[in-house]
């Protein structure tokens, strides 16, 4: 098995990569330790099992015994997002509960999201950003008390880089930062390198995966692929991340499924992107023009758990080689 990455790079696993495993949090930790990573990113509460203090204490003790750092997260904290689950309490109540859990489990951050691409229509996304900023400001004192930072992800096509930057700066970069996802920018017709260049100063943690993008009659198609199989120059992205975000975790979020079509040749598509600068879209177009259709795969199998582990371990091996050659 590959050795651990160099000490100046904290390699991790986002457990969404293993979403079909039906493991306990302790089993997740043991698997990650066997993969010789340093960070385990519990991006959703379901991977922790519960926020019960006894459970969180057990997770913390096992992680410490295995020499692993822990990060935790939740889903939407925007009360007007289509993703938001109000049955779990107000957005503020949910965030405070997560900060308390972060202290118990030893996580320096709480990862959260605004929503998804569905929140861009009818929009405007700026209204959802304002609602999220309001929630964050309402928990500022609690974040200070708990010594926790909130890492907002560019998630599932919800925000472009300049929009997430605005959210962080309006909420307060002293306690709000970014969970930088390398795959999601393409869902917002954005070059991942542009996303990194725009947000690097606010990055607290990350989700890393490779992508393939290519032109088609409607516009472009995007699919997420194992590391090294895409055409977004993921090697350069990783090297740039290590340089611009020193010490920040580089956590694999392996997701491999069929392509998403971005029909930007249809005028209606642009209702979701009325303010996208041409210079930014041009960078996305350049990626698509260099791409070739990605070979079709069996995107879903009877044994999704095995498929997920195979894809993740392929990406981990590639990333370790890349990081070692970079460092």
Residue ranges and their predicted role:
Residues 2-10, 26-33, 161-176, 186-327:
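Histidine-acidic metal/acid-base catalytic patches
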Residues 3-5, 62-69, 81-177:
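Active-site acidic/histidine proton-transfer and metal-coordination neighborhood
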Residues 9-16, 40-42, 68-75, 110-112, ...:
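Hydrophobic faces of well-ordered beta-strands that scaffold small-molecule active sites
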Residues 18-23, 43-55, 78-91, 118-122, ...:
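Acidic-and-aromatic substrate-binding clefts and catalytic sites of carbohydrate-active enzymes
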Residues 24-46, 101-109:
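Catalytic domains of carbohydrate-active enzymes, especially glycoside hydrolases
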Residues 27, 50-58, 86-94, 123-134, ...:
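Alpha-helix N-cap and loop-to-helix initiation/capping positions
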Residues 31-34, 58-62, 101-104, 138-142, ...:
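Alpha-helical scaffold elements within enzyme catalytic domains, especially in hydrolases
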Residues 50-72:
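Aromatic-lined substrate-binding rim segments of carbohydrate-active enzymes
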């Amino acid at each position: 098995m590959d050795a651990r990455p160099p000490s100046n790079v904290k390699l991790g696993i986002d457990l969404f990569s293993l979403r079909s495993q039906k493991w306990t949090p302790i089993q997740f930790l043991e698997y990650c330790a066997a993969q010789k990573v340093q960070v385990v990113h519990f991006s959703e509460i379901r991977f922790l099992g519960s926020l019960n203090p006894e459970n969180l204490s057990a997770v913390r003790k096992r992680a410490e015994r295995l020499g692993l750092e822990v990060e935790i997260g939740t889903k939407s904290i925007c009360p007007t997002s289509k993703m938001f689950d109000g049955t779990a309490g107000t957005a503020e109540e949910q965030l405070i509960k997560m900060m308390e859990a972060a202290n118990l489990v030893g996580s320096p951050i709480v990862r959260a999201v605004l929503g998804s691409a569905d929140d861009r229509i009818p929009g405007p996304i700026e209204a959802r950003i304002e609602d999220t900023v309001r929630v964050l400001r309402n928990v500022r004192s609690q974040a200070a008390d708990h010594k926790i930072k909130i890492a907002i992800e560019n998630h599932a096509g919800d925000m472009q880089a300049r929009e997430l930057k605005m959210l962080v700066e309006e909420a307060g970069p002293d306690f709000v930062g970014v969970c930088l996802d390398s795959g999601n920018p393409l869902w917002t017709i954005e070059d991942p390198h542009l996303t990194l260049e725009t947000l690097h100063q606010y990055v607290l943690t990350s989700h890393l995966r490779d992508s393939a993008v290519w032109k088609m009659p409607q516009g472009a198609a995007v699919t997420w692929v194992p590391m090294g199989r895409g055409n977004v120059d993921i090697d350069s992205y990783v090297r740039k991340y290590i340089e611009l975000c020193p010490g920040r975790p580089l956590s694999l979020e392996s997701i491999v499924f069929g392509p998403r079509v971005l029909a930007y040749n249809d005028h209606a598509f642009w209702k979701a992107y009325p303010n996208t600068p041409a210079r930014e879209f041009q960078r996305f177009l350049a990626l698509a023009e260099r791409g070739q259709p990605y070979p079709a795969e069996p995107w879903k199998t009877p044994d999704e758990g095995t498929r997920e582990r195979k894809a993740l371990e392929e990406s981990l091996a590639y990333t370790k080689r890349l990081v070692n050659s970079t460092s």
